[in-house]
Amino acid sequence: MGTNRPRPRTKDFFAAPALSLTLAGVFGRKNGPAASGGDGVEEGDEEVQAAGEAAVEISSENAGPGCRQSQSGGGSGEDGGHDDDDGEGSNKKRRRKNYHRHTAEQIRIMEALFKESPHPDERQRQQVSKQLGLSARQVKFWFQNRRTQIKAVQERHENSLLKSELEKLQDEHRAMRELAKKPSRCLNCGVVATSSDAAAAATAADTREQRLRLEKAKLKAEVCMPPPRSRARPFRCATLQDTDSGELAMLNLFQIERLRGTPGKSAADGIASPPCSASAGAMQTNSRSPPLHDHDGGFLRHDDDKPRILELATRALDELVGMCSSGEPVWVRGVETGRDILNYDEYVRLFRRDHGGSGDQMAGWTVEASRECGLVYLDTMHLVHTFMDVDKWKDLFPTMISKAATLEMISNREDDGRDGVLQLMYAELQTLTPMVPTRELYFARYCKKLAAERWAIVDVSFDESETGVHASSAVRCWKNPSGCLIEEQNNGRCKMTWVEHTRCRRCTVAPLYRAVTASGVAFGARRWVAALQLQCERMVFAVATNVPTRDSTGVSTLAGRRSVLKLAHRMTSSLCRTTGGSCDMAWRRAPKGGSGGGGDDDIWLTSRENAGDDPGEPQGLIACAAASTWLPVNPTALLDLLRDESRRPEWDVMLPGKSVQSRVNLAKGKDRTNCVTAYAARPEEEEERGGKWVLQDVCTNPCESTIAYAAIDAAALQPVIAGHDSSGVHLLPCGFISVMPDGLESKPAVITASRRGGEASGAGSLVTVAFQVPASPSAAAATLSPDSVEAVTVLVSSTLRNIRKALGCDSCEEEF
């Protein structure tokens, strides 16, 4: 180690055996010869590896393209001979740097640390250098080179996937161009259409469109003209119940389909009204549909409505900021729950309007107010863009939002910024059970940047008396200024302060869920924040490159992780849309008794059809059944049972008595309970299953947990694990779509378990079990057959019976 050593040359590190890596060495390597060596061996280095020589440490300072490794046993020494500068016996010889080989034990220890922390800090590097007898620079460059090689391998794999996708798109493009060159044919008879026929058809279409526009303008003038005795009464827009089939043809069909939430279906005499939730006899108030508006894509009645809505949103923003930053006496900490409780008298004194909050205290209405704070692992701008995009917002809260739409953009920006954007929206909120009616909301959403790293998103329902907007009597829920403040924190996190303040019309709720809905847990701020934290962790883990091996078994590539997590998210979202009490799902009680009876549990039935619009589900008529019940068990104990691989044969009717083992396990959050798992029968029983696996997605937060699973062919899942697109994989999910505390702290639990930190307490659990089965391969089938009804109800009742038996509470009775 002389002081006059010249600067070394740069070595080609891709040829070094120590850095010939594969993803299996990072994610799935087991203890063995390969693990002890630490790296894969390239073709030209097999003899060196077989001789037991350790890999060479390569760094940015001791590498050169022309260097070769010394074969000296001591692991140190000069590499090759000396190069003479003058060739005439000069005494100045260029001395090459000594290269030190790492022993197998050194590589093993550094690999173990790399799996836990690919980016060690200075303290960790110093500790490793002292432990292994290496310099801190050697440790630093070893980790740097390892990360570089892993990134290169991942990029090559992703590039190959992108290349194959590009070739596929090019083939489709060529096929479409060839098809466009062919002459057009009539869709009805198949005859080639001539240019004269096409011109005549276009002329007829234009004439018909002009006639419809004239009739529409006439009807619009008649509807908007109030009678002489009611000029002071507010305008009520027409709904489907007020319009006959002849007038329906004059309405904006796109607006009807968008607001009603129907998947583009129409009846013979007009637009078909979607079935409404009938999950309880007194829940018929849920049958009201979103109002229809006969403006060309517009929602406002007058041009001067926009300034009034902007003024309303500005006032709501000021109130939201005050509600988020206020302490006592506006918000009082609850003694039993520890959550913030709104002091309504103080709220009216500080914030509320000229009428003193009388609108919130109308007969037949209840007021719910809650506030929650939490840290979210996502940057501020990503959250802001997600909240202002209705599709992304709905996908972010699959357990809470069943339908959502943007009605009209009031204020927008030409660039991609979101500061000052104001839009009118519609949403239908749900609890994951058919026994609780959904909540329909029409509101204005306003996004405003308050400071450099501080944003506010406020929702407020619009009042026709102040804005002139088409407010409908069908709206059953009203948003007082609600929303969230987002403040940027360090390490890519942000602080979320959420306020949920609504008033709803009183409606009959099943006794099972009265405590949950009355306390505000079902639709409160705490549930919104918990769901947001869960989904943000899922998105972060989907793109993370430093996931420990124990949290990513069975999948060796980043693209594979993304594909599997995307498939699991689609499975859970599909089951959430099916199980809620939305107007689109006409739930009815299943007949009790017989082989399909559910015992004392009420089983709800409905059906839906897939005419080929969703490639991720089987086509035809699908029978759906769900049952909600109370179990005298802590939610943690119930969740532990459902996740226990060894106890799954006790309750899973899809694997009756079959022992299973986990083939894939991907964590998607800090809590390893949130994971995606693929189960398969053990090798001695796998032949009986015919290559069927069970894909399961577990999502848990302090407010509720969901467990969605579905049978899937192993041959269909393997390409997804390899990183290919999962949109075409057929899944028909089922599962325990909702496990939440019952809200009755005074009721003693029969079975208890140690709770995780921060989990909601409760004496028992409210559980909703849902199953789906194909009823008919044809979507034209109108009703479910008795065999389909019996099959799906037996699955639900058998699963509940098995769960009670496994928990030892099959003899317990509900006490509500």
From Swiss-Prot:
Q: Which residues form the START domain?
A: 302-541
Q: What are the entry keywords?
A: Coiled coil, DNA-binding, Homeobox, Nucleus, Transcription, Transcription regulation
List, alphabetically, the InterPro entries matched.
Answer: GLABRA2/ANL2/PDF2/ATML1-like (IPR042160), HD (IPR001356), Homeobox_CS (IPR017970), Homeodomain-like_sf (IPR009057), START-like_dom_sf (IPR023393), START_lipid-bd_dom (IPR002913)
Question: Pfam families per the record?
Answer: Homeodomain, START
Is Transcription tagged as a keyword?
yes
Give the organism, scientific name.
Answer: Oryza sativa subsp. japonica
Protein's UniProt name: Homeobox-leucine zipper protein ROC9
Is Nucleus tagged as a keyword? yes
Question: Where is this protein found?
Answer: Nucleus
Where in this protein does the record put region Disordered? 26-104, 265-296
Q: Entry's SMART domains?
A: HOX, START
